[in-house]
């Protein structure tokens, strides 16, 4: 239902945010700019 869809959308958005920060951390470590 609506609740499940909202939960899925939230998980997708949260997952993107986590992935983005992991990528940012990894790239800053690789370029030694942390």
Swiss-Prot record:
Q: In which tissues is it expressed?
A: Expressed by the skin glands.
Compartmental location: Secreted
Q: What's any one GO cellular component for it?
A: extracellular region
Stored Pfam families: Antimicrobial_2
- The lineage's top-level taxon is Eukaryota
Which keywords has UniProt assigned to this entry? Answer: Antimicrobial, Disulfide bond, Secreted
Tell me its family: Belongs to the frog skin active peptide (FSAP) family. Brevinin subfamily.
Q: What does this protein do?
A: Antimicrobial peptide.
The name this protein carries in UniProt is: Brevinin-2Rf
Species classification: Eukaryota, Metazoa, Chordata, Craniata, Vertebrata
